[in-house]
């Protein structure tokens, strides 16, 4: 339907005035191409990048990663930092829990000499530091570990046992309103690590909830639920964890997909084993009995030996990684089935993760 000519002139004048006053791009038609392509940073796990749909975590947005203790939350964020640093990006880690291990971070590939780190005294201080870093426009990734440790100043200065109902939630709500716009303008990725608590008296449905109120749930573009689902053993020795990540909220692609990978103790995400699994799934790696082959060349009997072969032959690892990324990430935005890369998720699982 054609718009009246007088209305078109009035609209053009209004848009011109808005752009003159607030800057180019402050208002645009939704179909314009300027904001449609989301820039992302890899998580370090190919299957999780595919599950996220856009090929990684979106820049200029807020992301929440939550799960039980020792599920791999901090490890995953350190892998994101390592991925970003390999691309020459500047990263910051706000260590509210005062528990960051620099030696472990270094083992995961983090350049600790160029990682900005802060151990704030109060929750307000931590969030002000986040705001200052995002407004600078120089920092690409900020990680806050964790929301549960962001203690309001009034609570720190008060007595143990004093009631501070809703104080942390109000602090987070105010911070989200302030941070969201600044992150978009500076194209900074802000990741909040969060812990799980149990709602008391819940008889039906999921009793789990996250700390810090509801504001973070609403402002987060992506929410990831990370769980340890098993152990990786070498004989009787436990050397890692089988990990599942569910994308419970996603504003940049289809939600409710999931990815599974191994986190090896002291090493991080087992990208080699992940490539073997994805290679077999997508018929780039052949499996006959216990033997794995790539391009007609046998690379090992059993997954452990095939994984070690890839470690020892980086050129083969890079070739397989490139092929899988081209195959999977080119179609990641087309809302493919989660079964293509991680195993199917039941309807009940999806229902449990709804907010």
UniProtKB/Swiss-Prot annotation:
Q: Which SMART domains match?
A: AAA
Tell me which residues bind ATP: 67-74
Judging by the UniProt lineage, the source's domain of life is Bacteria
Where found, per UniProt?
Answer: Cytoplasm
- GO CC entries: cytosol
Q: Which PROSITE patterns match?
A: RECA_1 (PS00321), RECA_2 (PS50162), RECA_3 (PS50163)
Task: Please name the GO terms that the record assigns under molecular function.
Answer: ATP binding; ATP hydrolysis activity; ATP-dependent DNA damage sensor activity; damaged DNA binding; single-stranded DNA binding
Q: Which residues cross the membrane?
A: none
Q: Quick one: a GO biological-process term for this protein?
A: DNA repair
Could you tell me the keywords of this UniProt record? ATP-binding, Cytoplasm, DNA damage, DNA recombination, DNA repair, DNA-binding, Nucleotide-binding, SOS response
Biological function: Can catalyze the hydrolysis of ATP in the presence of single-stranded DNA, the ATP-dependent uptake of single-stranded DNA by duplex DNA, and the ATP-dependent hybridization of homologous single-stranded DNAs. It interacts with LexA causing its activation and leading to its autocatalytic cleavage.
Q: Which family does it belong to?
A: Belongs to the RecA family.
Supply the name of the protein.
Protein RecA
Origin species = Proteus mirabilis
